[in-house]
Amino acid sequence: MEFLVRSENRLPADFPAERRAELRAGERARATELRSAGVLKRLWRVPGRNATVGLYEAADPAELHDALMSLPMSPWLDVSVEALATHPQERT
């Protein structure tokens, strides 16, 4: 299944800079792992916001949930998920 995942980082502005840097590095590393595993297909930034839009592939919603919760910043992410269905024009 493919999923469109929108996430906005809600890390507090006064969060310690050193810890913020650690989380960002961990987030980058985990995203690379998810990409290598074929779970994270595409990732875009949203201009003007601390937000991303990603195309993920997982066997089911539970597997996607596990992948998203494995992100180091997951406690501070505001996430919305839309399951995607193939459009008839894409089936040819």
Model-found features: residue ranges?
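Conserved, structured core segments of small domains
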Residues: 1-92
